[in-house]
């Protein structure tokens, strides 16, 4: 008898959640076991009515009451304990970790400790605690499969489960669209950028925070950290190229001079389906790539123009993993301030440079220390912003 794969979707109402559910609608291979949301209770209720999960998770009691008033045939859990439960129950086969921000850390760790197949879209799990998460994955025989289009591309280009291939890798090259301001070469051209302009990504449909991160190249800087942990490579073996068409998602250069790249139209259903079905491949409805319609171009990502990259590469080269926690937490606070029109666009990176330079912590030995560094950084940023 055919048994559907049971999946928990952490962050079901976000853009990754949307694409994951789109894949599930197109196939008959998955059963939604649990859905979680932070603020959009109405959308979560609609998804519960459509997919009939056993559990739904919301952050507090007021949202629980609201959800229960909208749907009656789902068990509603609350807060961190609820997230960790639906990430680790024995019935679950796959956990899609798509919560935005450090809030995704604990449920991702819970899934790793339970030995689950984790589809990782939550950057912060690796950015802030990569050394700790990889240890848990290895120790508990879990699987960690990247969902970001760039990392999933690398995952497809190398045999990631055969560590013998890693010495054969000469360079991992992450591609970046460059965001909406990729053709503005001077920072002074960005002085009066508005949140609406920063969120207008030319290639991808994404949430507001990640759209801003793409425009500042912080998103790519965080992906450099992820690649460092996911593929066990040193910082000097990671490169970044601006690729405006977003067709070549990443490239691996081998020591014999061979290059292997993964290409596809910019549609998140492709990497998500790849991760969901791995080690097999499933059929999903995505546009075919017509090579006759594209001219693929690449150029260097200038560290002076995109200073976020410079900060992160310096942190990795010095093995200063705590500084990446500071960088990430400061960025979250500063992007929120920008979206609320409390600071100028260029201050996102300017203030982050100042904060990352002034705050010094030892590398965390456990997840509690990660949260402590994160908390202290946010408090410091708040004091700087007044």
From Swiss-Prot:
Keywords: Isoprene biosynthesis, Manganese, Metal-binding, NADP, Oxidoreductase. Pathway: Isoprenoid biosynthesis; isopentenyl diphosphate biosynthesis via DXP pathway; isopentenyl diphosphate from 1-deoxy-D-xylulose 5-phosphate: step 1/6. Disulfide bonds: none annotated. InterPro entries: DXP_reductoisomerase (IPR003821), DXP_reductoisomerase_C (IPR013644), DXP_reductoisomerase_N (IPR013512), DXPR_C (IPR026877), DXPR_C_sf (IPR036169), NAD(P)-bd_dom_sf (IPR036291). Its cofactor is Mg(2+); Mn(2+). NADPH binds at residues 13-16, 40, 122, 124, 207. One of its GO terms (molecular function) is manganese ion binding. 1-deoxy-D-xylulose 5-phosphate binds at residues 123, 149-150, 177, 201, 214, 219-220, 223. It is an enzyme of class 1 (oxidoreductase). GO terms for biological process: isopentenyl diphosphate biosynthetic process, methylerythritol 4-phosphate pathway involved in terpenoid biosynthetic process. Belongs to the DXR family. Catalyzes the NADPH-dependent rearrangement and reduction of 1-deoxy-D-xylulose-5-phosphate (DXP) to 2-C-methyl-D-erythritol 4-phosphate (MEP). This is 1-deoxy-D-xylulose 5-phosphate reductoisomerase. It comes from Francisella tularensis subsp. holarctica (strain OSU18). The lineage of its organism: Bacteria, Pseudomonadati, Pseudomonadota, Gammaproteobacteria, Thiotrichales. The gene is dxr.
